[in-house]
């Protein structure tokens, strides 16, 4: 009898957890900011967001310039949020302070940057667990490299995922941001 009770408890717990994850959106998260404080995604309600995992020593690092351009051009309706991560080839080895200095000095980054996180593996940040979860079936799966982009709509829902090779100024991304 105890085994049956335990199995039922586990089943209902897992079912509730799955339902909660499915109903989540970006407004359920906040993250530590690169230069201290917190990035609360509730502050961006009503705007689209482009969430990007970044790195300072990657072949795609020049996308910082395009991301900054995008933020300046569309900042009234779009927020770019960068997430430095050292998951791919050790291409983000710096401290938060070093990353902030690099971004400002080389690209004039003014969009919000989160503190360094892990975007995959056992220590994957909760936000990236949600972004890559099976509930987001069209976008599921591990991040493959730096500068993958996740488009969030004005209601906080994940609506598209773009791989590293997609320029932030790619026509498909710009069109999705303008819709």
Regions found by a protein language model. Give the residues of each.
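Short, internal strand/loop/helix patches
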Residues: 97-146
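Thiol-/selenol-based redox modules, centered on thioredoxin-like
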Residues: 126-129, 133-179
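Bacterial Sec-dependent N-terminal signal peptides
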Residues: 1-24
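Thiol-based oxidoreductase modules, predominantly thioredoxin-like and allied folds used
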Residues: 77-95, 110-121
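Conserved helix-turn-beta segment immediately C-terminal to the redox Cys motif
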Residues: 47-48, 57, 61-86, 103-107
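Structural recognition of the beta-strand scaffold that forms the well-ordered cores
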Residues: 49-52, 79-82, 112-115, 151, ...
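N-terminal "domain-start" segment that seeds a small globular fold
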Residues: 19-42, 126
